[in-house]
């Protein structure tokens, strides 16, 4: 018989840096999940990522307090800032441009995010990433 799902928890945790402090501890504690077990498993699974890279994770909690989790690809905004070599985007993206990014870098990011994105094809996914770049104050050039 399949386990009964008690709920889902969506978090964004730094790769290799999951610990019982907020936001991880309180979110898992509410559902009665073993916090240290999750932290060890998450840190082991995210070893391949750069330390500190934000990784979205969806935790499925079952009624017997066991859990499974699925990691996603890092947010497009983080990947764009990393590719452009910036710390943050523009507070006023329509007037203040903070940097430029090449279309080839946008394509690499779209390929990285392809598993998590629902775009019909690569061109649509690239346009979505370009829109994110523009909303951050980045100029996309060929």
From Swiss-Prot:
One or more lysine residues are methylated. One of its GO terms (cellular component) is cytosolic large ribosomal subunit. Part of the ribosomal stalk of the 50S ribosomal subunit. Interacts with L10 and the large rRNA to form the base of the stalk. L10 forms an elongated spine to which L12 dimers bind in a sequential fashion forming a multimeric L10(L12)X complex. One of its GO terms (biological process) is translation. Belongs to the universal ribosomal protein uL11 family. PANTHER family: 60S RIBOSOMAL PROTEIN L12 (PTHR11661), LARGE RIBOSOMAL SUBUNIT PROTEIN UL11M (PTHR11661:SF1). Transmembrane segments: none annotated. The lineage of its organism: Bacteria, Pseudomonadati, Pseudomonadota, Gammaproteobacteria, Alteromonadales. InterPro entries: Ribosomal_uL11, Ribosomal_uL11_bac-typ, Ribosomal_uL11_C, Ribosomal_uL11_C_sf, Ribosomal_uL11_CS, Ribosomal_uL11_N, Ribosomal_uL11_N_sf. This is Large ribosomal subunit protein uL11. Keywords: Methylation, Ribonucleoprotein, Ribosomal protein, RNA-binding, rRNA-binding. Forms part of the ribosomal stalk which helps the ribosome interact with GTP-bound translation factors. GO terms for molecular function: large ribosomal subunit rRNA binding; structural constituent of ribosome. It comes from Shewanella piezotolerans (strain WP3 / JCM 13877).
